Design a protein with these regions (language model features):
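Acidic, glycine-enriched loop/beta-strand segments at the rims
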Residues: 16-28, 340-341, 345-356, 361, ...
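Divalent-metal coordination cores built from histidine and acidic residues
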Residues: 53-58, 62-67, 75-164, 183, ...
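Histidine-centered catalytic micro-motifs
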Residues: 61-72, 193-199
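Polyanionic/metal-chelating signatures
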Residues: 102-109, 113, 124-140, 147, ...
C-alpha cells in the first residue's frame, strides 16, 4: 500500500538521525499535512495512520546542492533518479546555466515534480543574453551593468544566488572583476555564490584563490562545486587545499564545498582544453598524461556518431586507426561541426573521465564544511545520478568508515540546507517540512555503474516529500508533492 501523509501519520520504532550531527535515538515522528509536528515517545492518536519503521533509520530527506535535474525535469516528473536514492530537494541552475527563473518557477507551480526544486541564476546565461555569440573576450562596463540588472531580476524571482561555470563557455572568458561585480548583486539580496571554479586541474590554486577573493570582497557565502583535485600531479594535496579553505574561514570568509563520491567526473571534451586550442597536439598529450588516460575517458554521448557512446577514447582510437591524441582532437572538431549545424542541440557530446585519487576524495569528503551532492541528471548517464547518497552511506560510512552515519546524514541534510540557504528543510524536528527518508543502514548501497548508470540503489525503503510518499518498495508512487523553493521564502 502506498502511504500518504495527507492528514496525520505516526512513524514508530524508528532510529532517528535528525540531520544536526546529534547521536541517533529511538523515537516516533508525527506528521500533520506537510510538517513534522512532534518527535519523541508518542502513542498513536485515534484514526491516525501508523508506519512501523522496524528499527530502520529515519533521516531528513537528502538535499542535492548541485543538480542538473532541471534538464528533463518536466519529462521526468517522478524524479526517479533522485527519490530512489532518498533525495527530496534538488538545487539547479548550476555551472552558470539556468532557465529564466520567473517562468521556470511558475511552471513548477503549475506542474509540480515529485521533489522540491530551488535554483541559482547562472552567470553563463546572463553573459550569453548580453553578449550573444561575441563572448570570447572580457565584457565591457556597459555589458556588466546589463548583467547586473538581469541578475537583480533573477534574484527578485527567487534565485538562491549566482552560479558560475568558469571552465565552460562563455564564463571562461570572463574577468574576475566581472564575476565579483555580479556576486555583489547577489549579496545585496541576501544571496550566495556557487562556482564550478575556473580550473580543477592546471590552474587550480589560482581558481581557489579567486573564489575566496570573491567571498571576501563581495561579503557573501561562497561554495566550491563538486570539489576535486582532478590532475595527477595534484594528487596528495587535499590537505593543502583544506588548509587554504580553513584559513579563509578563520579570516571571515564563509566558504564551503560540495562533493560526490566518485573518482570520475562527467563533462565535455572541450573543457579539457582551457585555452580552446583544440588542434594543439601538445595539449591533447598533456590531457591524456595528466588529466585522464585514453582508457579512462568514456564517451557518454556523441551525437555525430552515436555508436561511440559507451566506448573509451582508446577503443575509438583503435576503431579509427589513429592514436589517442589525434582521435581526441578529431572528436572535438566533429562535435563542434555538429553543434554548428544543429543550433538547437545543446547536448552534443559528454565524457566521463577518471581523474581523482581515493585518498584525496576521502579527505575532502570528511571536511566538516563539505556537503554531499550528485552533479547528476535525471536520465543518469553518470552513475552519480542514481547512486551518490547510497554510495556514501554504504561505501564510505559502513565499509570504509570515513565518517560516522550521523555525520554523513548531516552532510546530506542539515549542512546541505545551510550551505545553500534553505529554511525548515534538512531536519527532523517540530516545524520542519516533512521531507524524510527511511533506509536500512545495513544494506544501503549504490548499484549504478558506468555500464548500467540507471540501476537503482538498495536499502532505500520509503521517501516522503512535503508529507506525501513519493517512493516505496522500489517504485515511485506517482505523486507530485514537490514545490518550487524561491529564495524569498525557500518554502
Amino acid at each position: 500500500m502506498l502511504l500518504t501523509l495527507a492528514a496525520s501519520l505516526l512513524i514508530v520504532n524508528a532510529v532517528v538521525i535528525d540531520g544536526t550531527g546529534a547521536p541517533r535515538r529511538s523515537a516516533a515522528v508525527r506528521v500533520r499535512g506537510d510538517r513534522i509536528t512532534e518527535v519523541g515517545a508518542l502513542a498513536p492518536a485515534p484514526g491516525e495512520a501508523v508506519v512501523d519503521a522496524k528499527g530502520l533509520v529515519l533521516a531528513p530527506g537528502f538535499i542535492d546542492t548541485h543538480s542538473h535535474g532541471d534538464r528533463g525535469l518536466f519529462e521526468h516528473g517522478d524524479a526517479l533518479a533522485a527519490v530512489s536514492q532518498g533525495i527530496t530537494t534538488i538545487v539547479v541552475g548550476q555551472d552558470g546555466g539556468s532557465p529564466p527563473l520567473a517562468d521556470f518557477f511558475a511552471r513548477l507551480d503549475r506542474e509540480p515534480a515529485a521533489i522540491n526544486v530551488a535554483s541559482y541564476a547562472g552567470h553563463g546565461r546572463l553573459r550569453g543574453k548580453v553578449m550573444g555569440e561575441d563572448f570570447r573576450r572580457h565584457a565591457r562596463p556597459d555589458e556588466v551593468a546589463r548583467m547586473r540588472e538581469l541578475l537583480a531580476q533573477e534574484m527578485k524571482a527567487g534565485a538562491l544566488g549566482l552560479s558560475s561555470g568558469l571552465e565552460y563557455d562563455p564564463g571562461i572568458f570572463s574577468a574576475r572583476s566581472e564575476v565579483l561585480d555580479l556576486a555583489k548583486v547577489a549579496a545585496a539580496s541576501g544571496g550566495r555564490y556557487i562556482s564550478h571554479v575556473r580550473s580543477e586541474d592546471r590552474y587550480f590554486w589560482d581558481a581557489i584563490d579567486e573564489i575566496i577573493t570573491i567571498g571576501r570582497e563581495a561579503k557573501l557565502p561562497v561554495q566550491v562545486s563538486h570539489v576535486k583535485l582532478a590532475m595527477h600531479s595534484l594528487w596528495g594535496q587535499a590537505d593543502r587545499l583544506l588548509r587554504m579553505l580553513d584559513e579563509a574561514r578563520a579570516a571571515g570568509v564563509d566558504i564551503t564545498a560540495d562533493i560526490y563520491p566518485y573518482l570520475y567526473w562527467q563533462s565535455t571534451l572541450t573543457v579539457l582544453f582551457p585555452e580552446r586550442d583544440f588542434q594543439n597536439r601538445a595539449t591533447a598529450e598533456f590531457v591524456l598524461r595528466e588529466i585522464s588516460t585514453a582508457d579512462d575517458l568514456l564517451l557518454g554521448r556523441f551525437a555525430p556518431e552515436p555508436s561511440y557512446a559507451g566506448k573509451t577514447l582508446a577503443e575509438i582510437a583503435r576503431l579509427r586507426g589513429t592514436d589517442p591524441p589525434a582521435t581526441l582532437m578529431a572528436l572535438i572538431q566533429e562535435a563542434l561541426a555538429f553543434e554548428a549545424a544543429h543550433k538547437d542541440d545543446d547536448d552534443v557530446e559528454s565524457v566521463i573521465g577518471t581523474s581523482m585519487s581515493e585518498p584525496d576524495l576521502e579527505r575532502l569528503l570528511a571536511w566538516p564544511y563539505a556537503n554531499i551532492c550528485t552533479d547528476g541528471e535525471l536520465d543518469g548517464r553518470h552513475p552519480r545520478g542514481f547512486g551518490t547518497y547510497p554510495r556514501v552511506l554504504g561505501r564510505y560510512v559502513r565499509e570504509r568508515k570515513v565518517v560516522s552515519l550521523e555525520e554523513a546524514v548531516r552532510k546530506m541534510t542539515g549542512l546541505a540546507a545551510h550551505n545553500v540557504g534553505l529554511r525548515d528543510r534538512g531536519a527532523i524536528r517540530p516545524g520542519a517540512f516533512a521531507d524524510v527518508v527511511l533506509f536500512d543502514p545495513a544494506t544501503v548501497i549504490d548499484r549504478a555503474t558506468t555500464r548500467d548508470p540507471q540501476a537503482r540503489a538498495a536499502g532505500i525503503q520509503r521517501v516522503w516529500v512535503n508529507g506525501a510518499v513519493v517512493y516505496e518498495a522500489g517504485a515511485p508512487s506517482g505523486r507530485r508533492p514537490g514545490r518550487a523553493l524561491r529564495r524569498e521564502t525557500t518554502r
